[in-house]
Amino acid sequence: MVLSEDLIGKGFSLQNVDEQDVEKYIDIKRICHKKYVDEYNDGWIEDIQTIINTDSFHRMLKYSCFQKILLYGTTVGLFAYNEHPDKIGEISLLLTEPVRKKGIEAFYLGHITALSRQVSKPIFLNVYKTDPVRDLYKHFGFKIYDQSRTHYLMSFNQDHTNDIYNANGIRNYMNRILIKE
């Protein structure tokens, strides 16, 4: 993945995440999600969130894409996705406040939606109900197909894939991936 000349000109660069980035990942996750964890999950308890996010970080190291976003050499965000045989999932976009709405969001969403069309695989993601990034996902064509107590479940390109189960709708797709045969 290569950044646009515009983003490079603004001082942005990308690097693959490695084991040494775990603390930075937890810091950025705290900056981006603490208010939602406080709102929906009885508060950000540091010890518990460190365990959860360290585990998440190590799983993400195995994803198809897990990169850090740098501004003049300083890590200011991270993004990830994981391509599976029948979908693109584990979507994550974490940006600190100073770099939000500077074009990184559009770059990342443009990249994964183009990939989805190219490989004919739907994208699935979860977004906190009160997170305003939901509107950006909608702008890029994501649709809410369900919800939990805390999240909207969104999809992109689900209607235009080679998924043989697609005719029966998203519920059957979700059942197929969640129920082991």
Protein language model regions, located:
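A short helix-loop-beta-strand connector motif used in the catalytic cores of GNAT acetyltransferases and
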Residues: 55-68, 77
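Conserved active-site alpha-helix within GNAT-family acetyltransferase domains
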Residues: 106, 129-146
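Conserved GNAT acetyl-CoA-binding A-motif
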Residues: 116-128
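Conserved acetyl-CoA-binding loop-helix of GNAT-fold acetyltransferases
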Residues: 101-114, 139
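A short, internal acetyl-CoA/4′-phosphopantetheine-binding micro-motif in the GNAT/acyltransferase core
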Residues: 92-101, 127-128
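Conserved beta-strand in the GNAT
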Residues: 68, 74-82, 89-92
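Conserved N-terminal entry element of GNAT/NAT acetyltransferase domains
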Residues: 1-20, 160-181
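Conserved GNAT-fold acetyl-CoA-binding loop/helix
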Residues: 33-56
